């Protein structure tokens, strides 16, 4: 997590905005593939607020967090810092329509009522199929919640709100 956080904050230092379409880079199946996630990362941008990539299938576990800048980050830095003539700048801008360069910032995300208008711009999601991923998260919570209650419940407590911290 620390590496992802540092990458995100360095991105801000370099002038990058949040990119809440970054989590749409990989498919649901690709996020479970260790080799794919190590090669491409999880998101097209470290400026995303992605969900932690926990798999329901431990044998099919990709990276939990991004560990490398994504293709959008490389493209945005190239655009911001390349010292090129007008033709070179046009060549960089021509790449803006690539799917891995999709962009949406805080003004576009749908965190709250009446805020944003792009359903692909969301925080704490992951994959190009966020509905399937959300269903997977519900299954994950339903699978681990009973174990958490049993493992960390204070004696006599009846609610998850009375869990003890692991020692």
Name each model feature, range by range.
Residues 1-4, 161-167:
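Conserved small/polar residues in nucleotide/adenosyl-binding loops
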Residues 23-25, 29-165:
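Conserved catalytic/binding loops enriched for acidic/polar residues
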């Amino acid at each position: 997590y620390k590496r992802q956080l540092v990458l995100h904050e360095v991105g801000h230092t370099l002038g990058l905005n949040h990119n809440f379409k970054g989590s749409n880079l990989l498919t649901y199946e690709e996020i479970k593939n260790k080799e794919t996630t190590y090669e491409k990362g999880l998101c097209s941008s470290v400026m995303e607020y992605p969900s932690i990539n926990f798999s329901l299938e431990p044998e099919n576990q990709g990276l939990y967090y991004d560990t490398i800048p994504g293709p959008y980050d490389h493209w945005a830095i190239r655009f911001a810092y390349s010292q090129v003539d007008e033709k070179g700048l046009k060549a960089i801008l021509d790449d803006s329509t690539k799917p891995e360069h999709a962009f949406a910032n805080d003004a576009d995300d749908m965190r709250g009522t009446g805020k944003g208008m792009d359903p692909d711009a969301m925080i704490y999601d992951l994959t190009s199929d966020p509905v399937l991923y959300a269903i997977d998260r519900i299954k994950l919570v339903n699978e681990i919640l009973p174990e958490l209650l049993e493992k960390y419940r204070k004696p006599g407590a009846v609610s998850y709100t009375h869990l003890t911290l692991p020692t």
